[in-house]
Amino acid sequence: MSHEEDLIDYSDEELQTTDAAATTATPAANGGQAKKDGELTVTGGRADKKGSYVGIHSTGFRDFLLKGELLRAITDCGFEHPSEVQQVCIPTAILNVDVLCQAKSGLGKTAVFVLTTLHQLEPVPGECSVLVMCHTRELAYQIKNEYARFSKYLPDVKTAVFYGGTPIQKDIEVLSNKDTFPNIIVGTPGRLNALVRDKKLSLRNVKAFVLDECDKMLDQIDMRRDVQEIFRATPTDKQVMMFSATLSQDVRPICKKFMRNPLEVYVDDDTKLTLHGLQQYYIKLSEAEKNRKLNELLDSLEFNQVIIFVKSTIRANELDKLLRECNFPSIAVHSGRYKEFKEFNKRICVATDVFGRGIDIERINLAINYDLPADADSYLHRVGRAGRFGTKGLSISFVSTPEDEQVLKDIEKRFEVALPEYPEEGVDSSTYMA
């Protein structure tokens, strides 16, 4: 496919045509049929020179035949067994096959593309081979840190992160010096497009093009336009991988316009809320009762770290101030301040939805929706902060308005669950504390 004919516009007619073509294409390894493995659905994987779908059920990362340096780093991180999504994606991804993957938060999607691209990478000084884009600076930093810990035994690999809101001249200085020029670039679409447009960044050597939380970028027209322009600046023959915790039927065909017969992996049916080990409850109360109830919960519940979600930056700052006045070790995180919380210097974090997607802090085992989100997908991303990688966790949502009650109904309908009311006697800590 040419960049021009497929990426200029997405009309309804185009999307229907693309979706029809994708669903009628015959995957290389399964005769055109979707492979169902419990609640995991796998389709596709092209049979051209980039390789074909490989089915493998691995019991350890060594089964993937990754570089020895990567295996050492994986061992250092304490990982013994790949998650379900890693078992399905990595063996095929390392063959340079395009990948479209939807899996709930905490199932190890980031490690799929980090390990795949590091395994394939042959670093050349002054050349960018891997380009990873995401929609927030927090997520960009987290991905960069994942590359850092898995590439600790690959000293020639250089990684940099670029995002808006900072002086672009600093980024230009990094790109102008061959000694600091990164082989792997992680960033947000707006800043990366500015660097490409001003000819400060050449993408002619990119071999892997990755979008994390792809639905967030491709849903928004401005961000999607930046992604398109960056995509056009990369070679035609490259691997494309896209990942998200939520991937609606409307967004999937848009994603596939960037790909060639991708391996499609959908872990758990996307109509079901399957955050294993996470206990979920709601509490009906008035707006005026929220602060008292929050204080009661923080006093009575055991937790390692808790994240409290509110609907605006102003409310985050106000609630954080109130909690600190009550001597709770709190910090407000809404656009970039999460290092102190991540390093366990603070146990309570008040956050907005910017923090709800992709941010992975392993000690969080309690999530409280002080303000319920506006939609079901945002609820999934929020409560997914607790109970990462299938560990235990607890989420409690405050329901105080008719709009909240409707969102609660939407959540139950969307994910086919019935959320119970929080019991008056509380809950046993053994049900949510690992």
UniProtKB/Swiss-Prot annotation:
One of its GO terms (molecular function) is RNA helicase activity. Residues 293-430 form the Helicase C-terminal domain. SMART domains: DEXDc, HELICc. It is found in: Nucleus. Transmembrane segments: none annotated. It comes from the Eukaryota. A motif (DECD box) lies at residues 212-215. Keywords: ATP-binding, Helicase, Hydrolase, mRNA processing, mRNA splicing, mRNA transport, Nucleotide-binding, Nucleus, RNA-binding, Spliceosome, Transport. This is ATP-dependent RNA helicase sub2. The lineage of its organism: Eukaryota, Fungi, Dikarya, Ascomycota, Pezizomycotina. The gene is sub2.
